[in-house]
């Protein structure tokens, strides 16, 4: 049994081997790389040709074409009752477009939206969405039909003017292109993303496009600049303003370009004696509600300042009215510039004139777009004329037969009466009067009423008209220039019927209309405060009146426990502000970019402005009127290290920040001061020691350097400040208990770097710790802020200049539990400049 089984197994193996060999003979070995490439290209071309790109001739993608043809087939013309959108979508899906219903309905909705299409192709009834991005109602609720304009796309389609191809299941045919009496691609544009390419064609004004086409027909050697005399530029359904003509020229010349779009704004006076910016037209594609929310967010973040209120008063009657109400005294142009910069009130439209030409994607310039449309119309009118000619000849042929019958009516009647049947009568008539089969059949079908003399006259007149029409058609086909004349006449009628005024305004170069924000900013001194929790604000320094030494001051913020003003300084709104953190990170910004708020406001979080790490703290700052890359600064750390560096290393810091100093463990950056060549620099410690050194003795270093030793400190001492000393300036010191004094800089001798320094104050329980040391001129003023956010402004010369060992005098009266948190200098030259 075992032997028999082995023989059977061997037989099966041989059969399997033979079968495998036969299969392998029929297997083609191909490269997977080539197969992937070819399959992907096949798929890509299918997407490009069958879905994503418009045909240059009728300007439609397949889905648009199928929707219009399905409506035409269902007789949904502009003068017929509306029909449920679901019915049209169902027809399109069942007969022509085997894709999702959402894609078809979404396309049909867009064809009915007056903010999406320059010239509507679908007349919708019901909720078809809004410019606020509200979704349309479901297709079972809405109704639609073709617009009169869309019907022009299908004119003469029944006259064999375009090629029909089988649909997806070969059950019927559909047009491969529409006759398109109107230049749809130019007037409505197109958008689509294919595989590896995209089209983004803007809409245009019908009158302008028609005028350009007419000019091209008369001057086919015209250059693009000649055509641009008629087509000024895109014309968007949402209107708006197009800034600059260079992008338009580039797009019309090369097929690609970028244009800048802006909303149309008007400035109105409100009932509360404020100015309001009213948005009346939006850039194409901008959603109003999204824009509204974006502006509100930017106002909250402090990126847009001076806005009191934002509200939407848009309606069907009033149109778009987005109101941006400004605060009193705010420069409107500054707010406008901020809106242009940060919101979609200004956008860019990238033009890509990509369309299918003979089934292949091609980027087209303006002249080519016009040329291919004219070529298509020539072909359509030629085929239409040939069809009309054949129909006219066929009808004339029949009428000629009827006239022969009427001329020989007695004999015709006799032949019919004597004939055995219809076929015999037809044959006899054909032989007797030399008629064709169609003529003979027409005579047999002719009713008796046509035998009257009046009917004979009508037939003769109709035949004469047909002969004239035949002559016209033959002449038209023999003279191509006459076909072009027909195209011109039809286009002019289209323009008269549907043409309207331009909506989008085109004005000159953007640079000609932009106003430099810096030129519009009021140059004034402002007091800038930063709280312990990182809230920043600016208020006019003039809002703090000058008081006598020893006063209480006025409320300068909203202190809450440990949340109080920690830093205070005065600067011009046009100054550059450099901010440094304890970790040695540097930022810079313009002072006017700091949110302008009331004195009692706590401010805006600085994290909305600067890219600060969670535990990072601001420890020092300075301002300069000009950004001079060669300007030197000196940085001082808590452990007495100093470093000199040029501002050029911080040029890229801006609001994202950059590391300005490499710190050792447990060290912190505490002070930064700009210095000029020849200045002296003084470092002060918490224990009351000051070291004066010469700036020239400190070498400049790169951004990554850690610095060098500046002052020697006792174990329990730390460095608290560092200031450049200019001629005529003295030091001003203030402690946390409000005790302070001025010291002449002459009291401090110039020492070498690394020394211990000289006493400038002896802190004790009465004075409290040293809070701030600054340099001040006799004519300057100072501002002192306390932890309960009281601020006092006094003249510097009201504080006596005392010796190094003197304790000082009372500068500010402090309430119980409060202490001084910072001191700011208001330079006299700023007051004079203001």
Swiss-Prot record:
It comes from the Bacteria. One of its GO terms (biological process) is DNA topological change. A motif (GyrA-box) lies at residues 547-553. PANTHER family: DNA GYRASE SUBUNIT A, CHLOROPLASTIC_MITOCHONDRIAL, DNA GYRASE/TOPOISOMERASE SUBUNIT A. Belongs to the type II topoisomerase GyrA/ParC subunit family. A type II topoisomerase that negatively supercoils closed circular double-stranded (ds) DNA in an ATP-dependent manner to modulate DNA topology and maintain chromosomes in an underwound state. Negative supercoiling favors strand separation, and DNA replication, transcription, recombination and repair, all of which involve strand separation. Also able to catalyze the interconversion of other topological isomers of dsDNA rings, including catenanes and knotted rings. Type II topoisomerases break and join 2 DNA strands simultaneously in an ATP-dependent manner. Few gyrases are as efficient as E.coli at forming negative supercoils. Not all organisms have 2 type II topoisomerases; in organisms with a single type II topoisomerase this enzyme also has to decatenate newly replicated chromosomes. This is DNA gyrase subunit A. The lineage of its organism: Bacteria, Pseudomonadati, Spirochaetota, Spirochaetia, Brachyspirales.
